[in-house]
Curated annotation (Swiss-Prot):
Subcellular location: Cytoplasm
Binding annotation for ATP: G7, L8, S9, G10, G11, V12, D13, S14, L33, G119
Organismal lineage: Bacteria, Bacillati, Cyanobacteriota, Cyanophyceae, Nostocales
Swiss-Prot/TrEMBL GO biological process terms: tRNA wobble position uridine thiolation
PANTHER family: MITOCHONDRIAL TRNA-SPECIFIC 2-THIOURIDYLASE 1, TRNA 5-METHYLAMINOMETHYL-2-THIOURIDYLATE -METHYLTRANSFERASE
Species annotation: Trichormus variabilis (strain ATCC 29413 / PCC 7937) (Anabaena variabilis)
Name of this chain's protein: tRNA-specific 2-thiouridylase MnmA
Reactions catalysed according to its record: S-sulfanyl-L-cysteinyl-[protein] + uridine(34) in tRNA + AH2 + ATP = 2-thiouridine(34) in tRNA + L-cysteinyl-[protein] + A + AMP + diphosphate + H(+)
Region called Interaction with tRNA, residue ranges: 143-145, 298-299
Site positions (Interaction with tRNA): H120, Q331
Segments traversing the membrane: none
Gene: mnmA
Molecular function terms, GO-annotated: ATP binding; tRNA binding; tRNA-uridine 2-sulfurtransferase activity
Length: 352
């Protein structure tokens, strides 16, 4: 019998993924990662629900303590990034270093199993010609999570199953209901796990970064107001600046070194290109010449036509066909060919 380890968060998606594989004849082992120190939904209610689902399905359930890893790779990563004036994207980092990597390692070393599965909405295929595993968008475009999975290595893709990739979200809930799963009607998470457990990103960051007053200035250096910490702002932000101006102003730069928030009109928050580092080429090998693609510079943004120019040291330059508003350092840029994820990386800081 084929064996698979299913990552269970205690939500409807991962629960349904486990039920589907169980019905397909897999020997399913449920695995929950204990991520956050202290109290929080994903390490209390979620863990309890995951255990209950395993009992319903008649499968074993294991819990792995990943709190120290999560603290180092996600909490510290976020705090350091925001303190340096960037807006980090923790989810792709978490998927690679906290979830998929450790899950595959645990499955192989502790359970003698080469396959894992999760409730992510994405698809994986194997291309015989290139000998590469390809990451594809989910059938349900509204739920597609391929953007957050761009950093998975070929080894991790080869070991992973996404049972929900060919399904609509409504089908997931229907299957969960048909199986009588406790999580069938469980509401979806609406924000980052850290935000949900702390109330807001501001509240989370204020636990780690002390307020530090500084100037809000325009691009010419004129002081327009005061702020209480650059970590409270993000590129493109318009609301909550606390300054009066005859025209709308947006955050165009976060100068953490000089403790300044730089604002300007919309044109100043618009860029024709950006540089991306820590690039992972997914469905194709790294090209030696520029390629055409469609890029997303944030999760819910529409794909935009772009020329991807390879640089040295796992970096690329993205040149957009049309200037883009609010390109945010620390966020992921992920480029596609249709449904296929070609590659992605982290947007670097730039100066206005």
């Amino acid at each position: 019998m084929k064996k698979v380890v299913v990552g269970l968060s205690g939500g409807v998606d991962s629960s349904t993924a486990a039920a589907i594989l169980h019905n397909q004849g897999y020997e399913v082992i449920g695995l929950t990662l204990w991520l956050m120190k202290g109290k929080g939904q994903c390490c209390s209610e979620g863990m309890i629900d995951a255990a209950y689902i395993c009992e319903q399905l008649g499968i074993p359930h294991e819990v792995v303590d990943m709190r120290d890893v999560f603290q180092t790779h996600i909490v510290d990563y976020l705090v350091t990034g925001y303190g340096a004036g960037i807006t980090p994207l923790p989810c792709s980092q978490c998927n690679k270093t906290v979830k998929f990597g450790p899950m595959v390692q645990y499955a192989r070393e502790q359970l003698g199993c080469d396959r894992i599965a999760t409730g992510h909405y994405a698809r994986i295929s194997y291309d015989e010609a290139s000998g590469r595993y390809q990451l594809l968008r989910a059938v349900d475009r509204n739920k597609d999570q391929s953007y957050f999975l761009y950093d998975l290595s070929q080894d991790l893709l080869a070991a992973s199953l996404f049972p929900l990739g060919e399904m609509e979200k409504a089908d997931t809930r229907r299957i969960a209901t048909e199986h009588g799963l406790k999580t069938a009607d469980k509401p979806e998470s609406q924000d980052l796990c850290l935000v949900e457990s702390n109330g807001s990103m501001r509240a989370f960051l204020d636990k780690y970064i002390a307020p530090k007053k500084g100037d809000i200035v325009d691009t010419a250096g004129k002081i327009l107001g005061q702020h209480d910490g650059v970590h409270h702002y993000t590129i493109g932000q318009r609301k909550g600046l606390g300054i009066a101006a005859p025209e709308p102003l947006y955050v165009v730069e976060l100068d953490a070194v000089n403790n300044k928030v730089v604002v300007g009109d919309r044109t100043k928050a618009t860029q024709e290109e950006c540089t991306v580092s820590r690039v992972n080429w997914v469905s194709i090998p790294e090209p030696s010449t520029p390629i055409r693609a469609a890029v997303q510079i944030r999760y819910r943004s529409a794909p935009e036509p772009v020329t991807v120019i390879p640089l040295e040291n796992s970096r690329v330059r993205l040149v957009f066909d049309e200037p883009q508003f609010s390109i945010t350092p620390g966020q992921a840029a992920v480029w596609y060919d249709g449904d296929k994820v070609l590659g992605g990386g982290i947007i670097e800081q730039f100066s206005n």
